[in-house]
Amino acid sequence: MSARGPAIGIDLGTTYSCVGVFQHGKVEIIANDQGNRTTPSYVAFTDTERLIGDAAKNQVAMNPTNTIFDAKRLIGRKFEDATVQSDMKHWPFRVVSEGGKPKVQVEYKGEMKTFFPEEISSMVLTKMKEIAEAYLGGKVQSAVITVPAYFNDSQRQATKDAGTITGLNVLRIINEPTAAAIAYGLDKKGCAGGEKNVLIFDLGGGTFDVSILTIEDGIFEVKSTAGDTHLGGEDFDNRMVSHLAEEFKRKHKKDIGPNKRAVRRLRTACERAKRTLSSSTQASIEIDSLYEGVDFYTSITRARFEELNADLFRGTLEPVEKALRDAKLDKGQIQEIVLVGGSTRIPKIQKLLQDFFNGKELNKSINPDEAVAYGAAVQAAILIGDKSENVQDLLLLDVTPLSLGIETAGGVMTPLIKRNTTIPTKQTQTFTTYSDNQSSVLVQVYEGERAMTKDNNLLGKFDLTGIPPAPRGVPQIEVTFDIDANGILNVTAADKSTGKENKITITNDKGRLSKDDIDRMVQEAERYKSEDEANRDRVAAKNAVESYTYNIKQTVEDEKLRGKISEQDKNKILDKCQEVINWLDRNQMAEKDEYEHKQKELERVCNPIISKLYQGGPGGGGSSGGPTIEEVD
């Protein structure tokens, strides 16, 4: 289903996102307008505009309550979710509940607004799409978007919805470690040797995944996956922030906790110090006037940073052990350990991992920040039918991260699809009634590994009615679970005797956005986009009239023009320029056409005088009399 134009791969990260495109037989990771190959997953709302990416992150200290980040830690979760509740303690912005779903609350253009996490993520995706469009010089319609391997069904659905709101045709949702494995596998293409067991250790800003794959002749088969959808670089920052806030309190008897701006400035300094500590053993922190005029100058050693995070760092090995157990592999059977995600640059994490694998060298051949987007771009090319030899013989076999099943008598979880089953997949099992003359059955679908459904996660439920009266155990009800390549589930139940069936696509019951919601958000996204564009045009018009005014002013004040222009004409221009400058000071928020009108007004006064000046100027060359002024459109 090749859409028009190339398809892109987007790594939608917790803290940073990255976009790539596969063309001319290779992947390009695309830099944004600031020249950065990763873009902060930040959206800020101000009195006048909406900012996304670097611009949003750069102003966060001035505007902490209206700058949203970490949408990925909210997406597809319930407001009551314990992790959401604990995260809210760290966030400077407000999270409120609407129908059990979390929404962020901000003040935008003087009004209170609330947004679902899908909407915030769609704004980040829009930015990534625009970055790609600027580079490719055309519209982009299709994309592959990545998610942590351990994301559950509702988190995947919500991510797909975010893509839809952006106006993208989401070709597929793929797992981040799988995408990284493609990047690694392509990188290693042509190396000798048959099947390889590869462990991908992916520790990013907010999530942690471990996946074990076998790669053989372009076939990538995921054997197992484990992880923590809630562990990453930000958690390491949090530990340092708490530690230094305590130190500040001890030294200066002041608690910065309630002051969001101070906490934010400290966090930014901590993030920078953490990066420094990956290459140096000590980092200094210098923040002028952190709180109530008190400067905060201190330093932190690598050893101290490691001690603050010792339990978190050590904890990264548990999912590694679990993934090995699930793949039925011994650690000696892993041929390659591939590091992905910025947090894998931390020396202590590398050392723990290397020691766990008895000193085996870690593979650092792929850029940890870009590998996921790289793999997603390759997968996008495959899905729209790219025929270049590098990708045509790649096959990606992914797995479902959690077991899926239904509740049977006594609240027992009966799995139909075991975790780590390769997808797409379809499984059917026959069930029967529990009591005599039972005319309907309730099919309740769960995901999880526990024996009782109450400990697992309810995905959805439906009734199959109209079962003819019969003794218990006689009716035969066939339940089919069908998972597509995106990991999205359809469940069907059919009564064999009557052929009656009912089915559910696991979506809405898990707090997924309805079609109407998505359509509304698509329109709103368009509206915000056009507002952003209108604002850009407005600012451009303002800058144009401003630079025109100052240029004219400089031209007539130029010493070289003395004697070529009458004092009367000169004063006429200068008075008009001053009038426009005063008007600009008072009207910073005027409309585009008002600025254009002001510029034309000024031109009407200046043009006759300036043209007279250049015609009448000596030598008739005209251009020697100072800068010529072009109208800025």
UniProtKB/Swiss-Prot annotation:
Residue(s) carrying Phosphothreonine: T408, T414
Region feature Substrate-binding domain (SBD), mapped onto this chain: 397-512
Molecular functions (GO terms): ATP binding; ATP-dependent protein folding chaperone; disordered domain specific binding; enzyme binding; glycolipid binding; protein-folding chaperone binding; tau protein binding; unfolded protein binding
Modified residues (N6,N6,N6-trimethyllysine): K564
Single GO biological process annotation from the record: spermatogenesis
UniProt region (Disordered), positions on chain: 613-633
Region (Nucleotide-binding domain (NBD)): 2-389
Record localization: Cytoplasm, Cytoskeleton, Spindle
Domain of life of the source: Eukaryota
Positions with a binding annotation for ATP: 13-16, 72, 205-207, 271-278, 342-345
Family annotation (PROSITE patterns): HSP70_1, HSP70_2, HSP70_3
Function per UniProt: Molecular chaperone implicated in a wide variety of cellular processes, including protection of the proteome from stress, folding and transport of newly synthesized polypeptides, activation of proteolysis of misfolded proteins and the formation and dissociation of protein complexes. Plays a pivotal role in the protein quality control system, ensuring the correct folding of proteins, the re-folding of misfolded proteins and controlling the targeting of proteins for subsequent degradation. This is achieved through cycles of ATP binding, ATP hydrolysis and ADP release, mediated by co-chaperones.
UniProt-recorded name of the protein: Heat shock-related 70 kDa protein 2
Organism of provenance: Mus musculus
Gene that produces this protein: Hspa2
